[in-house]
């Protein structure tokens, strides 16, 4: 969803929706990697039923990553995708269903955004290549050092589009991957797997939502199914709320801004290509072969709990004294609808509503003030009440002028602060900064410039002599680097962006000045604002778009042909008289075919993915559709600072002209291209342990060509139709690996079959309600009346999925170490930097039980009697504290240890404060609960939950 910063805004406003994933890493023994056993209980204290993968969010980072070296070829890309799915699977561990959805042919409304994105990617890629070559030639001409240019084929990410050979090969590889895991991974043993590849029309996330909607409408659906959806798009949050499922979680990779990226020329960090100077890299050691490698830090995953977001929204949207019955489900639907006004993949956002300016909060406040007058909610099951929406939009229009003026004031204030900050930093800089091997550096800074040189003066002197001998003359104006070596490119002028005043983008509209509406329509639409007919046409198209998008989220695609025919949105104050505007769409429309979509979204530079005769239509000057493929196009910054925030002014594709031109080249398609140009469906896979396995085998043995109903009692209530798969994977047949580096499956027990969701009439309405029998999860947020009803008890926030999760405590040795190095009181501690004291014994007297296991720890043979032990006393007497759980039975080995240590007196081994003991602590814990120890005036507290590392 095209809402930049939406997730950041959401996670800051509602912080409890985020939970960090607990991930069990694969182990390695003697060079052999041992995979994670996903059949074991989930370490996140929650069990998921269904896992849905929006595959395009996995394909892109695996094929062209930004923070690590890119795969060398297509085979490595496929292996990277497999490993990414394995990692997600080991975190979520679904028990019923794995649904993998790849983007197929998108609706016409989405194709405009895809076209803009692909044209931009092509243009930016060519511009980056030209700039890179220019800087390289400039550096080499001045004597700079650059690594030899690596000759490799550039990966065009535009190939990740339905209809290309890459996507066809990906589908084959995923079939092999599913068969391999169902045969060999115990976590996949009883799993149903559905693959919806790029031949099935529809966006990946919307194919997933369509599956959920259709299954919810079946009588055998479990209303308490726990769904987990993987994807990074903001619209997944809206789609998850639109299902009205009580248990819905989103897993996504945690976004860490400002990740360091290497320079494309010298592979060094800290600068971009335009700032590269071709300096030699300072290696940390003499033989540092890894100095030129990129850091490959593995990203972390987080859970986004939509049930907690529903709690937040219920509190925020609850209103008293309504003239109608309050319904939290309808209120959440209205909130989802209002989020569309700040932008999405199908419509531009309104000029007065920016997510960074808390536009959603403003809309919610207006909604709560106006809803008493509307007489009801804005939406119902994906259909919009335009009369009520008009009241909301006109209320926004009344404050548009003040919004524009405040935006200008905030921008001017920010620029003024930034300018003062630059001046202050420039003023505080020293007039002279020493450099070279005699430069003073902070103690212990191993990465400081010159630290390696200064550590070996003889080597440094030798290298300087050799360098002087190899350089016959050095100009007095030559600049030197921090290690004393001359810079090959001295005297480079300061770049314009380093100056105190940065040029601001030209803004001819000036929304903060009077006459902003006239200037806006003149500059953006080339029309007069007084032209009421044109303004109404723009508003009507936008209103149709709002209705289409909401229907798309709640009911499915209302029309495959509809699209918004303008680059810009109208003003909120223009939404007058929209109550009478039609919001119906043409029925019976069909999606584009894959190769037709490629012709509609690809620039001419990506024509190599198309058949030769089709490609010619994009570049031949005599082509009837040559105007669809401009070599260059304007980008309107639209008041923004960066080009990626601007609007690409591309011509819209005329579907009628495109189809007419393609009719002449359709006969040129080969049988393989014709197959790739056809629309397909979903495929279902099961292993030999699944109840459906024998049922599907019987269908293949009978050879029936008629669709057969899926027996819901054999697959957790899933319903639909089965039909035989021409490219089926069958038991006792070898599954050949499409990736040469992976082995063939010679002992296969997996079977696949075509699967089709339950079908409904075109005018059927899926009810946006919580199903009967659904149980809401326990509340996570602090009750608003907690202070009144808690009787003084302190609120304990829920940190994970389970409030009764058993904390894992540190053992005795860890507490001794922490107690030694941490401060003793309000001061810093006299041994805060000292190493832990050496242990005089091995083993732990009390070892905590591992959750879910009954492991008996081995008693160390060298554990000596207590009267001969002279080590430091333990800081804490280890105990078990289980919140909300009854006391566990005392195991025999625990009773034995207690009996053995019954005569132990904790104060008989006290030592003086010093390296071998512990300084006395302040007696400030008298009010804490615990078991008093002899010799102390305060009881000890239980192990802190601060170190709850499970």
Curated annotation (Swiss-Prot):
Compartment(s): Nucleus, Nucleolus
Bias-annotated ranges (Low complexity): 468-482
Positions of post-translational Omega-N-methylarginine modification: 824, 847, 851, 883, 895, 946
Keyword Cell division: no
Major location category of this protein: nucleus
Residues where Phosphoserine is found: 448, 471, 473, 475, 482, 487, 499, 501, 678
UniProt zinc finger (CCHC-type) residues: 261-278
Positions of post-translational Phosphothreonine modification: 439
A GO CC annotation given for this chain: nucleolus
Modified residues (N6-acetyllysine): 286
InterPro entries recorded: 5_3_exoribonuclease, Xrn1_helical, Xrn1_N, Xrn2/3/4
Biased composition (Polar residues): 445-458
PTM annotation (Asymmetric dimethylarginine): residues: 824, 847, 851, 880, 883, 946
Region annotation (Disordered) ranges: 408-508, 912-950
Biased composition (Basic and acidic residues): 920-937
Function: Possesses 5'->3' exoribonuclease activity. May promote the termination of transcription by RNA polymerase II. During transcription termination, cleavage at the polyadenylation site liberates a 5' fragment which is subsequently processed to form the mature mRNA and a 3' fragment which remains attached to the elongating polymerase. The processive degradation of this 3' fragment by this protein may promote termination of transcription. Binds to RNA polymerase II (RNAp II) transcription termination R-loops formed by G-rich pause sites.
Family under the similarity heading: Belongs to the 5'-3' exonuclease family. XRN2/RAT1 subfamily.
The protein's name in its UniProt record: 5'-3' exoribonuclease 2
Source organism (scientific name): Pongo abelii
Phylogenetic lineage: Eukaryota, Metazoa, Chordata, Craniata, Vertebrata
């Amino acid at each position: 969803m095209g809402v930049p910063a939406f997730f950041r805004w959401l996670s800051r406003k509602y912080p409890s929706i985020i939970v960090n994933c607990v991930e069990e890493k694969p182990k390695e023994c003697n060079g052999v990697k041992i995979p994670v056993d996903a059949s074991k209980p989930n370490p996140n204290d929650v069990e998921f039923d269904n896992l849905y993968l929006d595959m395009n969010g996995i394909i892109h980072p695996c094929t062209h990553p930004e923070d690590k070296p890119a795969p060398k070829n297509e085979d490595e890309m496929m292996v990277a995708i497999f490993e990414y799915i394995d990692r997600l699977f080991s975190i979520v561990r679904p028990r019923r269903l794995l649904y993998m959805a790849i983007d197929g042919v998108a609706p016409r409304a989405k194709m405009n955004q895809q076209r803009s994105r692909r044209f931009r990617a092509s243009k930016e890629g060519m511009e980056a290549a030209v700039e890179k070559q220019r800087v390289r030639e400039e550096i080499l001409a001045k004597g700079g050092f650059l690594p030899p240019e690596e000759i490799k084929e550039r990966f065009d990410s535009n190939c990740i589009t339905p209809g290309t050979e890459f996507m066809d090969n990906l589908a084959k590889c995923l079939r092999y991957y599913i068969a391999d895991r169902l045969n060999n991974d115990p976590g996949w043993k009883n799993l149903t797997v559905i693959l919806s590849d790029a031949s099935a029309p529809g966006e990946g996330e919307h194919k997933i939502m369509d599956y959920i909607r259709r299954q919810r409408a079946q009588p055998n659906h479990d209303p308490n199914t726990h769904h987990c959806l993987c994807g990074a798009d903001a619209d997944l949050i809206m789609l998850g709320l639109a299902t009205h499922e009580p248990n819905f979680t989103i897993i996504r990779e945690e976004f860490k801004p400002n990740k360091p990226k290497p320079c494309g020329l010298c592979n060094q960090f800290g600068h971009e290509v335009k700032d590269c100077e071709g300096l030699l890299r300072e290696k940390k050691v003499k033989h540092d072969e890894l100095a030129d490698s990129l850091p490959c830090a593995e990203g972390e995953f987080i859970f986004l709990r939509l049930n907690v977001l529903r709690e937040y929204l219920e509190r925020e949207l609850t209103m008293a004294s309504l003239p109608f019955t309050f319904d939290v489900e309808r209120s959440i639907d209205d909130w989802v609808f209002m989020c569309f006004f700040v932008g999405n993949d199908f419509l531009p956002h309104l000029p007065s509503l920016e997510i960074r300016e808390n536009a959603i909060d403003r809309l919610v406040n207006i909604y709560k003030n106006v809803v008493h007058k509307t007489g009801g909610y804005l939406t119902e099951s994906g259909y919009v009440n335009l009369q009520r929406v008009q009241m909301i939009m006109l209320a926004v229009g009344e404050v548009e002028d003040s919004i524009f003026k405040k935006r200008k004031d905030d921008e001017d204030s920010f620029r003024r602060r930034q300018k003062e900050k630059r001046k202050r930093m420039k003023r505080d800089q020293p007039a002279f900064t020493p450099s070279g091997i005699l430069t003073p550096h902070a103690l212990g800074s191993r990465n400081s410039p010159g630290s390696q040189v200064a550590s070996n003066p003889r080597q440094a002197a030798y290298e300087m002599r050799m360098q002087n001998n190899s350089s016959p003359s050095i100009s007095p104006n030559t600049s030197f680097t921090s290690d004393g070596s001359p810079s090959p490119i001295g005297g480079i002028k300061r770049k314009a962006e380093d100056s105190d005043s940065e040029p601001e983008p030209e803004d001819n509209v000036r929304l903060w000045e009077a006459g902003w509406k006239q200037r806006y329509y003149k500059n953006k639409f080339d029309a007069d604002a007084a032209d009421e007919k044109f303004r109404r046409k723009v508003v009507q198209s936008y209103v149709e778009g709002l209705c289409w998008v909401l229907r798309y989220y709640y009911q499915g695609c209302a029309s495959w042909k509809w699209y918004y025919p303008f680059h810009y949105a109208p003003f909120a104050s223009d939404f007058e008289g929209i109550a009478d505007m039609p919001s119906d769409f043409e029925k019976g429309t069909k999606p584009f075919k894959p190769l037709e979509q490629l012709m509609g979204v690809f620039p001419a530079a990506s024509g190599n993915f198309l058949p030769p005769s089709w490609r010619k239509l994009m570049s031949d000057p005599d082509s009837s559709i040559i105007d669809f493929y401009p070599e260059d196009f304007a980008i309107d910054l639209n008041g923004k600072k960066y080009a990626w925030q601007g609007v690409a002014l591309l011509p819209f594709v005329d579907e009628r002209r495109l189809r007419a031109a393609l009719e002449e080249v359709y006969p040129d398609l080969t049988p393989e291209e014709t197959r790739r140009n056809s629309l397909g469906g979903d495929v279902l896979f099961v292993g030999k342990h699944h109840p459906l396995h024998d049922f599907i085998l019987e269908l293949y043995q009978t050879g029936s060509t008629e669709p057969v109903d899926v027996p819901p009692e054999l697959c957790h209530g899933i319903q639909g139709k089965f039909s035989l798969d021409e490219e089926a994977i069958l038991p006792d047949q070898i599954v050949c690996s499409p990736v040469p580096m992976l082995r063939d499956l010679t002992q296969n027990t997996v079977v696949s079959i075509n699967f089709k969701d339950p079908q409904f009439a075109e005018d059927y309405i899926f009810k946006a309600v919580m199903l009967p029998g659904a149980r809401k999860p326990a509340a996570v947020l602090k009750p608003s009346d907690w202070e009144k009803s808690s009787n003084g008890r302190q609120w304990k926030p829920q940190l994970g999925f389970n409030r009764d999760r058993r904390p894992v405590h540190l053992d005795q040795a860890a507490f001794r170490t922490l107690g030694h190095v941490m401060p003793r009181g309000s001061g810093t501690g006299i041994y805060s930097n000292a190493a832990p004291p050496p242990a005089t014994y091995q083993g732990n007297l009390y070892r905590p039980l591992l959750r879910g296991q009954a492991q008996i720890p081995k008693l160390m043979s060298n554990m000596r009697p207590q009267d001969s032990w002279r080590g430091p006393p333990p800081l804490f007497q280890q105990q078990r504290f289980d919140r909300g759980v009854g006391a566990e039975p005392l195991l025999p080995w625990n009773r034995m240890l207690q009996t053995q240590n019954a005569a132990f007196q904790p104060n008989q081994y006290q030592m003086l404060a010093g390296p071998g003991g512990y300084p006395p602590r302040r007696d400030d814990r008298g009010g804490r609960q615990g078991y008093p120890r002899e010799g102390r005036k305060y009881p000890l507290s239980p192990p802190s939950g601060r170190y709850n590392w499970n």
